[in-house]
Amino acid sequence: MTNFTFDGAHSSLEFQIKHLMVSKVKGSFDQFDVAVEGDINDFSTLKATATIIPSSINTKNEARDNHLKSGDFFGTDEFDKITFVTKSITESKVVGDLTIKGITNEETFDVEFNGVSKNPMDGSQVTGIIVTGIINREKYGINFNQTLETGGVMLGKDVKFEASAEFSISE
């Protein structure tokens, strides 16, 4: 069994969404945690739970962030966390239940496992994974949008994300 200690200082969770049909808006969730159990040498034994604090959303625009926290989007007064609980993990895919605003759907995302390395600063063993995917926000009741004069919509339905998580590990 491997002991995993999440290193939030060396991890990130970023997203982007199409805006006004012509550009992308990017942001991040600044508070999240990932708990992992299992043997790093046998991916079939790994189980992980990611917990994201939606009120930590950061798009570098306070007014937009406040709107994203409202009931039009994440409803952070009522829904204080987003969770992803794995069902299976391989070196290239992860399948699990994603819950946003109390709505749960099974999702499959891509995984990039970057092996194990020794940290020269303290001698600890570290590992990292990068998880990428696309989430249809409308499946989670995040339906806010406005029609544009050109016939398009203000916001795309698909949200692309990249989560990079680093862990100290020990046996």
UniProtKB/Swiss-Prot annotation:
It holds the Pfam family YceI. Belongs to the UPF0312 family. SMART domains: YceI (SM00867). InterPro entries: Lipid/polyisoprenoid-bd_YceI (IPR007372), TTHA0802/YceI-like_sf (IPR036761). It comes from Staphylococcus aureus (strain MRSA252). This is UPF0312 protein SAR2769.
